């Protein structure tokens, strides 16, 4: 279970708010993270998949820096959350950025990707969401 504030306001998002009809890709990222910039085009491609909900968790970052990052590189996320002190990410078992977690519609973790996503990860994510 998790409860994290949105980047845009002080309202909270909880795992019970996840829709049950899609897969969810939770991406933990930061504007200061160079590998996050490297993987960003793959997230943009994944954002075009109808069966996938992209959730970005901005990690140990400033709101303005995070917004500028998304303004410059594009926003692939359906939902953007903010973990300014990193405690929520640590609760997920995340100790660095980027990390990405694929969750099915029953909120079960399918796969965890440590480090930047690459073309092979992109294929694996598509295979996972369309095979089930």
Set out the residue ranges of the language-model regions.
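A short beta-strand-turn-helix
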Residues: 2-24
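Short pre-active-site segment immediately N-terminal to redox-active cysteine/selenocysteine motifs
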Residues: 22-24, 28-32, 96
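Hydrophobic beta-strand anchors of alpha/beta hydrolase catalytic cores
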Residues: 25-26, 54, 100
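Conserved redox-active cysteine motifs that mediate thiol-disulfide chemistry
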Residues: 28-45
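Extracytoplasmic/secreted envelope proteins and their assembly/folding machinery
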Residues: 40, 44, 63-70, 122-126
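Conserved segment of the thioredoxin-like fold in thiol-based oxidoreductases
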Residues: 48-85, 97
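Thiol/disulfide oxidoreductase modules built on the thioredoxin-like
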Residues: 71-76, 83-130
